[in-house]
């Protein structure tokens, strides 16, 4: 049985290119912003903020239950509600790349150490 595209979870990736001295501050700011998103918007499954070893990149990953949930949160960036553009300026990001993906397969380890695979086709 084929799952509807509407039922697939949705992932947003935002990659920042920065100077190494800005990395820890940007990681902290993105972590706080992600916490606010989780409190204000329904449908957040998971989120992470990742930093490159060379200090020049930060990756924000947000996984949502639906595309609509992710897009609602993203609109808050565009409208200035989350002050995303101020965050970019404050940490002097050289480039910011936005990408979005539908999740078609995922593997996760449960609390009992079992692996669970979810394939959506």
Where are these regions (language model features)?
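Short, surface-exposed ligand-recognition loops at beta-strand->loop->(often short) alpha-helix junctions
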Residues: 17-30
